């Protein structure tokens, strides 16, 4: 694995754990950990963009609302699927 990809993974893992509210820290970090090993570089970039939305927007995304505000539908589908299992 190249160092750029590993740096991006580390950044995502850190950001997923330290969001703001404890509930979202737990939810987002579990979501990220469940998918991160299977993502290519492009998907990692999309995931990084997704988790940089505020908690309220991420909750709406996980409920299938406001999905037009995020371009990567595959990552959104993974978030919704994870929420439905969680």
What function would you assign to each model-found segment?
Residues 2-86:
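Positively charged, polar, low-complexity stretches
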């Amino acid at each position: 694995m190249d160092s750029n990809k590993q740096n991006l993974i580390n950044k995502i893992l850190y950001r997923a754990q330290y969001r703001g509210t404890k509930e979202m820290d737990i939810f987002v970090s579990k979501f990220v950990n469940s998918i991160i090993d299977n993502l290519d570089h492009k998907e990692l970039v999309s995931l990084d963009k997704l988790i940089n939305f505020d908690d309220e927007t991420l909750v709406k995304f996980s409920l299938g609302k406001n999905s037009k505000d995020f371009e990567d539908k595959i990552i959104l589908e993974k978030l919704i699927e994870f929420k439905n299992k969680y």
